[in-house]
Amino acid sequence: IFSTEAGAETVASDIKAKGFASAVMEIDGSFTVFAGLGKEKAQTSALNEQYKQKDFADFWGGKQLSCSISTSSSAAQWASSIQELSSLSSLTANGNSVSDDEITKAESAIKEIKTSDETEKKLLEKLLLAADNVKNNQGWEAQQNLLDVMSGISSK
């Protein structure tokens, strides 16, 4: 957690330079660097091990943080899709396989989200891209797309 956005962005850039995912989000006036998403503690712990192998020791908080989202409609559908994809992408980033059925289910759920907001339409495209990343075993790319979506819909 950083008091300035510039400090947080510097850390996020360093993380991305090593091939990982990261995004900065303002929460309660401070800037937090998110470096991965997972549905369960075991998933984020496995992501943490990968960070440690790249000399990011002790930076991963491993905390479960909540983030409020603000969308024009269907907030519950957004949250459900992000949660499901965070699980699938963390599994893929950790070298585990994901079934085609799980990916198809996630894609179908995303396609059910309706919005007329242009920004949200672009974010829905990123969610579909994240599902495609998972399908192609590109877990960190999927994580980055999910973090970008979270940045776009988080309420400050």
Region spans (language model):
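Short charge-dense sequence patches
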Residues: I1-F2, V98-I103, Q138
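Structured segments of extracytoplasmic/periplasmic soluble domains
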Residues: V11-D14, K18, Q50-K54, A109, ...
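Stable alpha-helical elements in mature extracytoplasmic
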Residues: G7, V11, L47, E102, ...
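Extracytoplasmic/luminal low-complexity segments enriched in Pro/Gly and acidic/polar residues
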Residues: T115-K156
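Short, solvent-exposed coil/turn linker segments
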Residues: D14-A17, S99, K135
